[in-house]
Amino acid sequence: MKFAVILLFSLVVLAVASESVEEVRREIDIEDLPEQQRGCADLRQPCTEGDDCSCCGSEGVCNCSHPHKKGCYCKTAGPLEKLAKKFKGCKNK
């Protein structure tokens, strides 16, 4: 009897876990969305020119002067850039 209860419980847990995995697969990958729809861009992702708040976190600032890439991309901020971004009051994370 204990074996049957344990087996039934295991099957229920397995069914719930597989359903949540399917849900995750159906969700849109945030990396595939344009920066404007994501709310903010990760490091080395396109960003909005002149808007450091378009880069996620306190570590990212928008850099439009990359020698090998056209356009603007988020980069790791230096100490002064981090301080300037903090005072801007960006609302993204």
Swiss-Prot record:
Keywords: Disulfide bond, Secreted, Signal, Toxin. It comes from the Eukaryota. Residues 1-18 form the signal peptide. The lineage of its organism: Eukaryota, Metazoa, Ecdysozoa, Arthropoda, Chelicerata. It comes from Lycosa singoriensis. This is U12-lycotoxin-Ls1a. Its main location: secreted. Expressed by the venom gland. GO terms for cellular component: extracellular region. It is found in: Secreted.
